[in-house]
Structures are given as structure tokens and as C-alpha cells.
């Protein structure tokens, strides 16, 4: 079974392809009907949008190919990895912080998700409960104690998990 991010990217790709193949041709045809294309702002806007969409479609196709090699079965069940919810304690302040490790496309700081390629994300990868990790952040070195790890496999489907 593929990762949830792959399914979301495929939906986004389908939306962009629909706009590129159905909506934009109609907008371009309508703009052409207005006459001189050299001074036609509608036509220029549609052509610009077409270029942007083509680039986005290519980027999404590449990312889907890259991520499609991973399956849920490859995600560890016993340590921090993609999709894990990790509670850490800041060694300096004693503050408890929960992070969810995700791919860069899924980052939502307001929801507590961080990229697996961020300094903290990289430091937490493959850690288990009880581990101590020191990471270099833009604000300096930080040490965290891993309090709990809930892997992607242990989470309800609506909260990032999928049955494997």
C-alpha cells in the first residue's frame, strides 16, 4: 500500500491536469475570440497560467514517482520515522512538545508537523522512547528527550495512519 502523501499528490495532479487540459483551452479560445493577441491581457494571463500549470504538473509527476517507491510496509513500527507523532521534552526548559514527522509537502507548523529533512526531523529519525537527541537548529544547539513515539501504523486513519 502506498503512502497517504502519494494519494494526496495524485489528487492534486489530477486537478492541475484537468485545468490544463479542459479549463485553460476554453479560456484561451475565448481570449483568442477577442481579437489581436498582442494586446490581449486575458490571453497573456491564460498563457502564463498554462506555463505555471505545466511546470507544476511536471513537478508533481516527478515527486509522485520518487515517493511511489515507498510503501507502508517499509515504515518501521518500532522507532521514529515518516508519519510518527513524537513527544519530546526540551532538556533546557522542560517544555513538552509534540511533532509529527512528514515530507516537506505536508508541513503545517500550526498543526505541529515538521519535515523529516528539517534539523529536528533528521535528529529524531530512527530514535526510540528514552533516547536523547541533540540537534543544531537555527537558534543554536538543542537537546531533547524522546518521551513517546506513536508510529504511522499505530495512528487512526484520520490522523495520518493507514492500515497496513
Regions found by a protein language model. Give the residues of each.
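N-terminal intrinsically disordered, low-complexity, charge/repeat-rich segments that act as generic
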Residues: 1-70
